[in-house]
Amino acid sequence: MEKITVPFITGDGVGAEVTPSMQAVVNAAVKKSYGDRRGIEWKEVLAGERAFHETGSWLPDETMEAFCTYKVGIKGPLTTPVGRGIRSLNVALRQTLDLYVCQRPVRWYKGIVSPLKEPQKVDMYVFRENTEDIYAGIEWEAGTPEAEKFYRFLHDDMGVTKVRFPETSSFGVKPVSREGTERLVRAACQYALEHHMPSVTLVHKGNIMKFTEGGFKKWGYELAEREFGKELAEGRLVIKDCIADAFLQNTLLIPEEYSVIATLNLNGDYVSDQLAAMVGGIGIAPGANINYKTGHAIFEATHGTAPNIAGKDIVNPCSIILSAVMMLEYLGWKEAASLIENALEQSFTEARATADLARFMPGGVSLSTSAFTREIVRRIENGNNE
């Protein structure tokens, strides 16, 4: 029997509901697809509020060791206290394991009500750089000695005179490297070719930030031409670019013009969430953080902890379920992945979903988290025939 160990973080808030839902669905799909030939052994590891209460650490060393050892894992949403000097746990996981690609597939499922007239035209795969840009977390608060020292360096050593209110300014640094750009664009181009997607679009603000965002555009084109010149010449791949604000408009007007998107960290955050809204919202938006060189990957719910609805059995578990679909595909277990997607789409088509989705569906039937989970498991076990 092929059995793999998958470390998982239940997560904070609604994580206690969506993560067990995902596991039940995945277990059913693996059992239906492979019988006793394959299986998953789930290994719980801690992070977030529960980890802090039980161990005194928000991100214990044992958790990082598990993800390092087993390489592929999955996590629910995590809390990071705002303004208390505690680094984002999601960012810490990505940077510690150097998970330089944040992948966000965006597609429409039949039955989901979309604000677009033709949501079926949306079929994109976002490759968001995950370790650099503003999200590198290099910043200093206004009024601190560090902020003053940084300003003095800018002013005295670098001749910068454009800071309008230096005494009350906080400062942040936006690192963008050639190496970081190249490995992201390389992964995007390889994905496009392997999945027969026609183009890679570099989304940037190089018109304003000429050396960071502009460097991303320049280095991205150079990498594509150097390593994928044959495919470009043969027409098997098109590399193009778009200013970020124009891209956000174009995705609403001509979404069919785009397939694989490569972009920096901050733009990628905005782009991913807008695209998710176009096909039903972040509640059904999956995500993954991957290092293609080492094979390490953490799949995750893309929404927050939603403490206001935690414990009420109403949260939509589809984000982490679809992230598990991505995980199964990454492992090469495509039969199980397809079973889950088909079961979800069939349920949506019949207007049976959690309340956040069902309320927009004509004749929609609102199901609790647990009832929706049972619904999907039943459809999987019955081969999606009923």
Language model feature labels by segment:
Residues 7-24, 33, 149, 153-242:
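Glycine-rich phosphate/diphosphate-binding loop of Rossmann-like nucleotide-binding domains
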Residues 12-15, 71, 127, 188, ...:
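Buried hydrophobic positions in well-ordered alpha/beta secondary-structure cores of metabolic enzymes
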Residues 34-60:
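N-terminal beta-loop-helix "entrance" segment that forms/cooperates
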Residues 35-41, 195-204, 228-241, 333-341, ...:
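Flexible, glycine/charged-enriched surface loops at secondary-structure junctions
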Residues 49-52, 250-352:
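Glycine-rich phosphate/nucleotide-binding loop
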Residues 51-157, 170-171, 266-270:
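N-terminal glycine-rich phosphate/adenylate-binding segment common to multiple enzyme folds
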Residues 64-81, 223, 227-296, 380:
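Glycine-rich phosphate-binding loop
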Residues 365-386:
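Phosphate-binding loop/pocket of nucleotide- and phosphate-handling active sites
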